[in-house]
Structures are given as structure tokens and as C-alpha cells.
Amino acid sequence: MTTAAIPGLQGEAPTNNQELLNWIAEAVELFQPEAVVFADGSQEEWDRMAEELVEAGTLIRLNEEKRPNSFLARSNPSDVARVESRTFICSENQEDAGPTNNWAPPQAMKEEMTEVYRGSMKGRTMYVVPFCMGPITDPEPKLGVQLTDSAYVVMSMRIMTRMGKDALDKIGENGSFVRCLHSVGAPLEEGQEDVAWPCNDTKYITQFPETKEIWSYGSGYGGNAILAKKCYALRIASVMAREEGWMAEHMLILKLTNPEGQAYHIAAAFPSACGKTNLAMITPTIPGWKAEVVGDDIAWLKFREDGHLYAVNPENGFFGVAPGTNYASNPIAMQTMEPGNTLFTNVALTDDGDIWWEGMDGDAPEHLIDWKGNDWTPESNQPAAHPNSRYCVAIEQCPTAAPEFNDWKGVKVDAILFGGRRPDTVPLVTQTHDWEHGTMVGALLASGQTAASAEAKVGTLRHDPMAMLPFMGYNAGEYLQNWIDMGNKGGDKMPSIFLVNWFRRGEDGRFLWPGFGENSRVLKWVIDRIEGRVGAEETVVGYTARAEDLDLEGLDTPIEDIREALTAPAEQWAADLEDNAEYLTFLGPKVPTEVHEQFEALKKRIQAAQAS
């Protein structure tokens, strides 16, 4: 196929990959865009797109002195978060999607979406965005190409992925790639005026696991539209991982170095908005300890030649929740944004062209423009920034970025943490007995709801196995089987699994543990447990730290609060048993025998504790 066969293509196609060119030509015929542009990932391209989006009213250029080369986008109020009810796993067999996913027959879904896609890019530019998951130097890279009519998405992907010419070169003339289609679903007829944030009330976020395709329609927001993020890095990658013998997980990756210079690496799975980014960017309060971030959201875990599990961050940027981020809770995130080059979405705008959100340092300004574009004062009875408002910034700007984030081999994982928001029941930190016990603990992870999903009822408890509930690309029971299989393969070289809970509350509702930088004290105990240097108390859930096992020097939290935070009350665990049993039943017949056996053992421990 020649370049001429792609109507509207600007200039020559920078590739001879016939499969790619044919696919683009088919997409042009379907979407009917006005122009087709290959994104090259250059600074010139970023600057040009930014200027165009400022002119269109999609972006607001922020104060150049305070936020150089940074922009604010305000989305349509109907398009502010992931939409789980419109997210589909379209496997050939419904059973392969399992009980936790919405399923539709792939052929029927493709026919349905083809109709909404038809002509959906009229009057718009279709961008061809080649990207690489993880470091571009990987000899066996996972590649993708997204076709999108959103320049905001292209700008976001330049931050979030290794995108552009280098990725296209990596695909080469016959390389394989995951095909990602995205349209905001807002065609422009001739003479029709555009809106600042085009989207459609009808939304689809669809994954096809057998063919490794992603089709998205109707949303311009984050994870619905930046298809390299949750759609590829977790939903499609988890399917690849099961087929190829690795794991794609919703985990941060943290490098910790002790005063002796020994480095350790921790991967941690928490549900969205439960503190992954804060932990990934932790500033340890214990003297002599150093923390560096490898990733804050997604980890791909693979065995290397030495038989150990290594973690790679497939992303290149942070897409962090803004509200609550400040110089006390997460100084590293704030410092990462200081050099600029940041895309903000749905935060508030100050009168001098800076940004603001709830929980930022200092008092709220006397006047703001809120995320909907309206005047706001401290007397206003609604938040100035949307609870799920975001900042998007490159990892390389982070002052504590570990150099290993650019190493395709990744880092050896010494410990895995699971954790959510539980006001009671779950102690501050516990080591599980072994990999199978840890898998069961992860399978029964439950947390309070957050605003990261558009449909969440905030505060209610929801089960979230391994923090992967919205992101498993296949049957949840088979996903847990992959955990068991990985443990069997790795044997005694597998990392230890721990359960943490920063959010225990006292009877009066106060937090019992100060959290944030003080969590380094818990991480030190985790490392000391791995090295066999510190004790623990056996509780119903595992080996739980005692107050005297933690390094509490210089901490002014009452010792009684810490002791209470470390309890694992058998009666509270007993109260969860029925709910947990029902949940394992809900997950279906493919849940591994080992998980059921571990749950039965937990029940026996709880009954024995209650009897004594």
C-alpha cells in the first residue's frame, strides 16, 4: 500500500509496515477523519498541539513563571472517571471473562461499535500514536499503536508512555503491536463549532483478549482514553501474562536503601486512591533510609535467569489523584510538578493562573474558577477541584526517580504488600505464612470505596482481589490460579507477602497511625522480617508486628494507639467470614483449591482464637 492510499495523510507515512498501513487505511474508511497525522513524540509536536488546544479552549495555559509549559483541561462533567459499567471484556466464551467483568460476544460488540465509530471522526484529525510499554531498550518489547481523534490524549501519552518515532522504529516493518482504537464520538459537520471537551453520552471501553485489541468510544478522560494505561498495561497485559508465564499487576514499585547501602525493592497493590502514589514517593522519617520510585501504579512481574521475580514499570509518567496532595502528604509529588511540563485535569484555577485543589497547603484562596469553569469562593458548598482530578507528569522529573525505572530487566522484588482502607479488623502490618497464604489474603482484599470510579458509592466496603477487580482481563479464578502457578514455579525464591492497613481508626474515628512518611517504620519492619532480624506475634491473619518490633524512635503517636492499630481482633475477622466465603463462591469454580484450603485454615484459626 502506498501513502496515497491513506486519504488525508499529512506527508509521507514514516513506516513501511504493511499490516499497520492497511489497518490505518481501514480505520480512515470507518472513522472518516479530515486528516491523518503520525505522532512523532517530539517537543515541537507537543508545543504545536498545546497551542492548538489552547486556541480551541480545551487547554488553559498556566502561569509560565509558576507552572512553565503546563496546562489545565476541564472535562465535561459527565466524563470525569473510569466507567466500570461500560467496560467490557469480550472473550469468545463468557466463562473466560468470569464473574467480575462485563461480557459481550466479541463479534456482536464489534458490529455495535463499528456503527457508532462510523464517521465519528468527521471534521477531526486522526492521530496515529505508536508506543512502547516499558523501556524502549527491551529486546522483547510490548508495543502498541493507538488511533485517536483527541490531541489531549496524544499529549497525555507523550508523558505516560515511550511514544512516537522510537516506538514506531521498534515496531519496524513486520513487528506485532496491540491495536487500540479511540474516538471521543463527537463528529463535526461542516461549519459546526467544536466544544472544549468533546465526548459522547454513550461510552464503551472494550477489550478483546483473544485478538489483543482495545476499542474505546465516547470518553476523553484518562484511563478510558489513554489506552496504554489500564486497558493495555493491566487488562490486555494480564491476559498476555497468563499465556506467557508472568504477572501484570496494579502495584507501585519502591526502591528502599538502608543506612548500610543495601537496596530492597517492594511492590505494593492498593486499590485506586488508597495511597499507592504517596507510598511510591515516600520520604522516610527514619534517619539514613532512602526511598526511590520505580513506579506508582502498575508493575509487570517476570522471572529472570536467576529464578527471582523482577518488576518493571510499563509506564513513563504519573497520572496522580490531585486532591489531598501537598508538601506534607507527598512533597515528592509536589516537587515533581515544580519544573512544569504537567497536564492538569479538573483542578481549580487561581486568579494568577496557578492551580489549586482541596488539601493543598495553606488556606483556600478567596476566589477560584472551579473545575466546571464557575466562580468559587470558600463559602461555596461544593469542591473547587473534582475529587478525581489529576496531574499527569513524567517520571524523569521526579527528584527520587530510581534510575532502574529505565532498565528493561527491572528490579528484584523482595516483598509484596497488599493493603486497602479498613477502619477496623486489619492490623497495621502482618507477614503472611507463605505464598499460598498470601495469595488468599490478596484474593480477599477489601477496601472502602473511593472517587476513582465514576460509579462508586464512597465509603462502602468492596472486595477488590489484589486491587485488580476492575482490571483483570480474564476469569478471576484463573487469575488467582496464575498467582498459585507463579508461586509453584518460583518456589522459595518468591518474595514474602505482607498485609498492611494505614487507615485503622479508634472508637472516636481518629486515625491510630500517622501514615505518610512514618510508614517507613513499617517498611523497615518488613525488610527486617525478610532478613530474619525482628520478631512478630502470631495472630489469626499471620505474623503481626508488635509495637516493640517497630522502630518508633522520635514518633510522638501514643503507644496505646499503635498497639491498637496492631491488633487483629478475632471477633472482627469472624464477622467478615461469611462475607468472604460468599465472595469466594461468587468468584466461581475456577478459584484454586489452594485458596479455599487457606481460607479454611483462616476459619480454624479464628474459631480457635475465639474459643480461647
UniProtKB/Swiss-Prot annotation:
Residues that bind substrate: 82, 221-223, 272, 388-390
InterPro entries named among the record's database cross-references: PEP_carboxykin_GTP_CS (IPR018091), PEP_carboxykinase_C (IPR013035), PEP_carboxykinase_GTP (IPR008209), PEP_carboxykinase_GTP_C (IPR035077), PEP_carboxykinase_GTP_N (IPR035078), PEP_carboxykinase_N (IPR008210)
Record Gene3D superfamilies: 3.90.228.20, Phosphoenolpyruvate Carboxykinase, domain 1, Phosphoenolpyruvate Carboxykinase, domain 2
List of residues binding Mn(2+): 230, 250, 297
Cofactor(s) it depends on: Mn(2+)
Pfam family, one: PEPCK_N
This protein's pathway: Carbohydrate biosynthesis; gluconeogenesis
Coiled-coil residue windows: none
EC numbers for this chain: 4.1.1.32
Functional summary from the UniProt entry: Catalyzes the conversion of oxaloacetate (OAA) to phosphoenolpyruvate (PEP), the rate-limiting step in the metabolic pathway that produces glucose from lactate and other precursors derived from the citric acid cycle.
Protein name: Phosphoenolpyruvate carboxykinase [GTP]
Lineage: Bacteria, Bacillati, Actinomycetota, Actinomycetes, Mycobacteriales
Underlying gene: pckG
